[in-house]
Amino acid sequence: FKEGDRCQYYHQIAQGAVRWVNTNHDGEEYLQYLAESGESIGEFPLFDEGVYAASAIAVVPTTVWRLPKSRFLHLLREHPDIHFAFSALLVKRLRFKFFLMKEIASHEPRQIVLSLINYLKRTSQHICMECGQILLTRRQIAEMTGMRVETVIRAMRQLNDQGLIAILDRKAYCEGSKGCVPGTCKTHG
């Protein structure tokens, strides 16, 4: 779906990954959310009769399950436990947006990137919990924070120089990580 389209379905990613982005008049993208297998996207207009707030773009070949809006709302009414779990998910995403806006307001790229990495580590998102590898590209971090890729690269180099992250073989790792030692991480070799 595209930003501005009318919502007719609940969407859940069965397999793959989807970027949920806004594009400005210059064609620059702002990454609102990177959804992976098992996650839903585009939920807002299911509840407020508005249009999609952002566009969904598959990152890799992706299978998405769609449930008509009326059936989804009926499901929530009939199963309060699902409704509460779904509400908790929306609150978690809203809390992340508040966090990110606060950090962006600091205007310090190094601090914005470090805070984002720490948040992702704390919430076990886009960080390999075995080896500490940051599973977002520098471009994705730039799109999430509204910074230029070059600014993110500089900030990450500074964080590496300060020992707050490690950059090994062009991959970034959380503080205290020694990198992905071959044969030790089930996810990365």
Region roles according to the model:
Residues 1-15:
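Regulatory nucleotide-sensing modules
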Residues 10, 32, 64-65, 133, ...:
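A residue-level structural signature of the nucleotidyltransferase/glycosyltransferase Rossmann-like core
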Residues 25-32:
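Short alpha-helix-to-loop micro-motif enriched in aromatics/charged/Gly
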Residues 77, 81-148:
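Polybasic "coupling" helices that flank or enter modular domains
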Residues 121-189:
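Phosphate-/nucleic-acid-contacting segments
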